[in-house]
């Protein structure tokens, strides 16, 4: 029997997974997966759980926003043998999922994981221990996504980020930047 680790953030995107969780789990079970389910409790929880349990499964599926996805990827990058990754978008904006054509309806995304064709995607590393697949950002407004409370995102969706961004305008300042790659350095 194939084994799956399903990690989800119950607070992401207006807590929408709560009404669909049983249907998602049923899809995976009927597809022949032995499931281990983990509900995230704190920041970096997905990363820690995936790093610890990911080596024991064939597939890791995460559901949440871009932050949950990035934590899951960071956990997977610590593994010697990497399982497949599935993603069920459940965040406020789901930019990454939209860019890949992953269905916004959670049960359809679960079916894609079960019946779809795996494909490779590039990852990057930021600050030596955090990985990403979609965006690594720095400078003005990058703190907005971290400063925006989950309650506000659940209430307002994407507009919550806009409000937090407007609040940040008064505190804009220049940043020192240094980028190193292939023996080259760019610094300003």
Where does each model-flagged region fall?
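ATP/NTP phosphate-donor binding region
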Residues: 1-63
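A residue-level signal for conserved active-site and pocket-lining positions in enzyme catalytic cores
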Residues: 9, 66, 144
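Short, glycine/acidic-enriched loop or turn micro-motifs at the edges of active sites
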Residues: 12, 69, 92
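Short amphipathic alpha-helical segments
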Residues: 18-20, 73-76, 98-100
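Hydrophobic packing residues within well-ordered alpha-helices of enzyme cores
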Residues: 24, 46, 72, 96-97, ...
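Catalytic core of DAGKc-family lipid kinases
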Residues: 31, 78-188
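Short beta->alpha linker loops
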Residues: 41-44, 64-67, 91, 139
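Short Gly/Thr/Asp-enriched flexible loops that form oxyanion-binding sites at enzyme active sites
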Residues: 68-80
